[in-house]
């Protein structure tokens, strides 16, 4: 995964190289300063020679100034490299996500992808900057300081080299303990983001049902989960610090003790002891910096794996080698089609991680999940075969969860079938260029989405170069023109995030108009008039008949009144087609359709009458 992620830093190879070079020059200046300090003490102060004090003092100031310049340049190049790396990663991830099918997105979840695009990439950015600065600085400082220590006093230097081994062991143990915890932390971030996203997008429903306390409890639990894991990880990192400080203080006492004896014995000068003390502290501080780098790498390794999973994910749906670039007509044919959603073992395993179980129980649980994953999957659609002629209006009705939305998703190839084939315009949908197919099969999904911007900007999602007249005509067909003209700025009215400043029915009509602007061969409305009154619903269908008679129209609805005048009606039940015919034919031959009709007309006849 590291190779997959790091290839996006290649564009910033030069600043990534220059930063360590300037860092090395800064370190070289800094590590020589204690050596000059010894000259000031021994050849200047102790020798009562102020000329040497000035000479070596000015040399020290010059070296400090150079160190500052080199350090600043190193920091600038490191910042450019790390932020550029993060920018490229975000671009690469976004481009990759755009290629994902619905199935790929289901695999990661929306909240999981948001966490990866924000928190995980920021972790990698910080780690990369630390690596090209501190990971270079610490070893160079350590090596040069060790050489200088041996040069000044090999006897005293040899006494503390064993300390390096102890610190290295502590750092290794820290990595082994904290890596698994940080992996869990970022999974909990996904759950936290999901909770926030769900609550904010449904805030009106939350308030309408007075569920604020329930949502707060759910959110607090997600926050507490992240808090507990972070405390667990941080406490283990902090626990190492007292041990390291104890080692450092012990080394200081040893230096003072043995250094004092060597000075008294005439084997060492005061200046040498001072510089030796500084160099030994440099070595110890370098070891601590290395430990910090290990911690940062530990945190970022989990992020690298999560980013790598997205970048290496193979899209389930791709363009064929020689795609068909034209959809000739709106004919649709389902040939013995079966489909099932992929079983996501990863999500179930993640849910199980919240439970405290012993190793044996965890292993048994994983084995059981794997067996379930290998077992035959429940089919959402099974053995569907039917023909729809170009220009026909098809109604689609059935109970909740019977596969209506899945059925229409296969037409625009949002998912691929498991068995059989779906044909549009006499070609298998797998033969088409994806953009070509989806431009000609316009879908208004069950969950309508509007984006921040003006009404015109939202409409032009359907056709980027649409004129104002084309937009108005589409809105007239969707019965949206009237309420748009009543808005203060008309078609230039700003749509707030998520379309929060328009009603559900208005949002649906805008989405229908957006789809109509594409002038598709096939128009699919997935329960897209559910928030529209029956009179407006009837006017929209009338506009379809008069303005787009050659377009194949598939209308999913829970209301018989919305589809009763369709050329044919599909009745679905638990993934199969239970009936296919006109309203009159189904009333005579299909008990399910007849029952739905009688329930609606007798139970709410006034509402459904046109």
Task: List the predicted regions and their residue ranges.
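Transmembrane helices of ABC transporter permease
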Residues: 11, 15-28, 39, 69, ...
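Hydrophobic/aromatic residues in alpha-helical transmembrane segments
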Residues: 33-37, 58, 74, 78, ...
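An intracellular "coupling" helix at the cytosolic face of ABC transporter transmembrane type-1 domains
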Residues: 11-13, 99-103, 119-132, 136, ...
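Short intracellular "coupling" helices and adjacent cytoplasmic loop segments at the cytosolic face
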Residues: 47, 83, 91-115, 119-121, ...
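ABC-type nucleotide-binding domain
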Residues: 327-610
């Amino acid at each position: 995964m590291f190779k997959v992620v790091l290839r996006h830093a290649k564009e910033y190879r030069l600043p990534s190289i220059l930063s360590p070079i300037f860092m090395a020059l800064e370190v070289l200046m800094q590590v020589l300063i204690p050596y000059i300090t010894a000259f000031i003490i021994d050849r200047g102060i102790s020798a009562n020679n102020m000329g040497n004090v000035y000479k070596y003092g000015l040399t020290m100031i010059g070296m400090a100034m150079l160190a500052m310049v080199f350090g600043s340049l190193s920091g600038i190049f490191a910042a450019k490299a790390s932020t550029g790396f993060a920018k490229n990663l975000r671009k690469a991830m976004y481009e990759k996500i755009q290629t994902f099918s619905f199935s790929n997105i289901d695999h990661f979840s929306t909240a999981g992808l948001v966490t990866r695009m924000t928190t995980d990439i920021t972790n990698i950015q910080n780690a990369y900057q630390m690596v090209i600065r501190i990971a270079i600085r610490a070893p160079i400082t350590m090596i040069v300081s060790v050489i200088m220590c041996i040069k000044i006093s090999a006897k005293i230097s040899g006494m503390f080299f064993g300390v390096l081994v102890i610190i290295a062991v502590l750092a290794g143990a820290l990595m082994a303990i904290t890596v698994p915890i940080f992996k869990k932390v970022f999974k909990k971030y996904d759950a936290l983001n999901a909770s926030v996203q769900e609550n904010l997008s449904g805030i009106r429903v939350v308030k309408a049902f007075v569920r604020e306390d329930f949502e707060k409890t759910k959110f607090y639990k997600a926050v507490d989960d992240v808090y507990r894991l972070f405390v667990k990880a941080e406490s283990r990192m902090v626990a190492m610090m007292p041990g390291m400080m104890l080692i450092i203080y012990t080394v200081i006492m040893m230096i003072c003790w043995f250094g004092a004896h060597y000075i008294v014995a005439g084997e060492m000068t005061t200046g040498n002891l001072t510089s030796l003390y500084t160099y030994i502290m440099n070595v110890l501080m370098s070891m601590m910096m290395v430990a910090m780098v290990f911690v940062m790498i530990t945190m970022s390794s989990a992020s690298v794996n999560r980013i790598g999973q997205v970048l290496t994910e193979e899209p389930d749906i791709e363009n064929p080698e020689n795609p068909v670039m034209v959809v000739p007509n709106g004919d649709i044919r389902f040939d013995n089609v079966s489909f099932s959603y992929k079983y996501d073992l990863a999500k179930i395993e993640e849910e199980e991680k919240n439970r405290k179980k012993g190793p044996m129980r965890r292993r048994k649980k994983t084995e059981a999940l794997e067996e379930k994953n290998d077992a035959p999957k429940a089919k959402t659609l099974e053995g569907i075969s039917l023909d729809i002629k170009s220009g026909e209006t098809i109604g689609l009705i059935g109970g909740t969860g019977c596969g209506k939305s899945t059925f229409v998703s296969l037409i625009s190839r949002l998912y691929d079938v498991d068995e059989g084939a779906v044909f549009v315009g006499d070609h298998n949908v797998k033969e088409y260029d994806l953009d070509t197919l989806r431009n000609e099969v316009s879908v208004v999904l069950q969950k309508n989405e509007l984006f921040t911007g003006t009404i015109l900007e939202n409409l032009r999602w359907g056709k980027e170069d649409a004129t104002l007249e084309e937009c108005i005509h589409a809105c007239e067909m969707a019965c949206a023109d009237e309420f748009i003209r009543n808005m203060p700025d008309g078609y230039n009215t700003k749509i707030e995030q998520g379309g929060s400043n328009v009603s559900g029915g208005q949002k649906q009509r805008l989405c229908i108009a957006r789809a109509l602007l594409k002038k598709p061969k096939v128009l699919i409305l997935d329960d897209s008039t559910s928030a529209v009154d029956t009179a407006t619903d009837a006017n929209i269908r009338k506009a379809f008949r008069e303005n787009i008679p050659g377009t194949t129209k598939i209308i999913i609805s829970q209301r018989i009144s919305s589809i009763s005048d369709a050329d044919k009606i599909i009745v679905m039940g638990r993934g199969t087609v239970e009936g296919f015919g006109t309203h009159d034919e189904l009333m005579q031959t299909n008990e399910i359709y007849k029952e739905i009709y009688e329930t609606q007309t007798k139970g709410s006849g006034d509402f459904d009458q046109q």
